[in-house]
Amino acid sequence: MPAPLSLRPSPSPLPLLAPSPRNASSIRPCSVRCSAEKNDSSSSSAEGPKPGGPKPSSWVSPDWLTSLARSLAAGAGDGSGIPVASAKLDDVSDLLGGALFLPLFKWMKEYGPIYRLAAGPRNFVVVGDPAIAKHVLRNYGRYAKGLVAEVSEFLFGSGFAIAEGPLWTARRRAVVPSLHKKYLSVMVDRVFCRCAERLVEKLQAAALDGTAVNMEENFSQLTLDAIGLSVFNYNFDSLTADSPVIDAVYTALKEAEARSTDLLPYWKVNFLCKIVPRQIKAEKAVAVIRKTVEELIAKCKEIVESEGERIDQEEYVNDADPSILRFLLASREEVSSLQLRDDLLSMLVAGHETTASVLTWTLYLLSKDDSSLKKAQEEVDRVLQGRPPTYEDIKKLKFLTCCINESLRLYPHPPVLIRRAMVSDVLPGNYKVDPGQDIMISVYNIHHSPQVWERAEEFVPERFYTEGPLPNETNTDFRFIPFSGGPRKCVGDQFAMLESIVALAVFLERMNFVLVPDQKISMTTGATIHTTNGLYMRVSLRQTAQALASTSSR
């Protein structure tokens, strides 16, 4: 690995892990830069307003809020050293309706890796510097979830995803032991593989008649089924039937995002939540999710009590029901049903959303790069020999893992992390922040910065090829933070990676796929990066997989 990089511009920035010149692919993912490429469906933005038409509203502040932020900073003798971005409506008119994190990247190129942005009723310090991100994420006592907790409490309640202080410490300590190695091994065989195989079975009809399929939708169904079985031992069966939970989760997450930039937090007024259509829709969505989780908890609790089950070993797995819910109930921890519901709801939402997005964008990137796709399928064929993957196979699927990590670099989930300063602090670079200051850590900016990554806008899986541990925030010095970092790093990172590797291995082993031409692949956000209109592909059964399966059965 090369020496640590400076974020100061250099004549020839080096990649974090040097790609092989002969094997590295050179396609460009969905990004601001590729929107003008002829016949390229990877444009990152929705179409702009028509000439002469009314200007759409924006999450970004009007000019007067930017001016006010700049005036207040100057008038108070700010001294923070943080430049104020000119967030004019015209600057983002071509991005409206698309991905909200893309304007942040545009302004980073103009103002540098840290700047102040007036957005709605607040001003944010936007960070695209790994050293500053490391400082904020590691100093948990100085920086809290803040705004994130405020706007998503209606969904997560007191769940560990947004809890603070002693409650967060206690809940994380209770949940983490359930994600042990033996549990993950069981999930690979009994959940991840089987759900992926059910997806392949579902797609066989489309493979025979050539019907285009929305792979984003299919991956969302797959991951909901997987998270249902792994967390609750319950099959949502969304691959074969419509699931109201998927729509409810997406509606709730979009509401949380909207609340973060509302000019007035009217959703704090209870009676308004009963009459405003957007709030009515959000409350109905949360009710669907909570009712589902509460019923599953009650059913499992009844079984555990009737059997008198207790955990008798560190890596405990109930053979009939290896779910996280069963582990938590069998641990006999004194916790209210409400708290347990909120904790498990956090896992349901985060686990479903994140992995579905990882699968969607990795498949998209592979569909645009024949060389990497061929290399990934050859590796899968060599390692698996026509059989389903096992837990022991995962470490052998090195190139496929590189593809997933590179997808996470280009399309991080979430693309932005938000923290709030609880005390006065001085950031690396001598930038000063006051108590109450909201900070946006733009993971997207860090992952796309040409000062951090060589060929930053290109899909180069080989940059992550290493014989050592998988890349993470620690061994990349916070240049790669797909699962956040510090004490509040995602507890399910290994779970998400294993599920992604297994699902893609099964899919690549059994199916060929091509992107439907002339479709516009644009981005929007919930908690993760979604496509605006789906990811449509045509699939076919692989003859290689059938031959290998036949050979291995002899």
What are these regions (language model features)?
Residues 2-158, 163-166, 170, 191-202, ...:
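N-terminal membrane-proximal hinge/A-helix region immediately C-terminal to the signal-anchor transmembrane segment
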Residues 64-105, 123, 149-232, 244-299, ...:
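Cytochrome P450 catalytic-domain helical core, especially the substrate-recognition surface
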Residues 91-112, 291, 295, 387-429, ...:
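Conserved cytochrome P450 K-helix E-x-x-R motif and the immediately C-terminal K′/meander segment
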Residues 180-181, 282-359, 392-397, 420, ...:
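Conserved cytochrome P450 catalytic core segment spanning the I/J/K helices
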Residues 223, 227, 231-232, 285, ...:
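Central I-helix of cytochrome P450 enzymes
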Residues 350, 467-500, 524-526:
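Cytochrome P450 heme-thiolate "Cys pocket" and heme-binding signature region
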Residues 370-372, 439, 494-530, 534:
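Cytochrome P450 heme-binding "Cys pocket" and the immediately downstream C-terminal segment
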Residues 441-471:
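Conserved cytochrome P450 K-helix/beta-meander segment immediately N-terminal to the heme-binding cysteine loop
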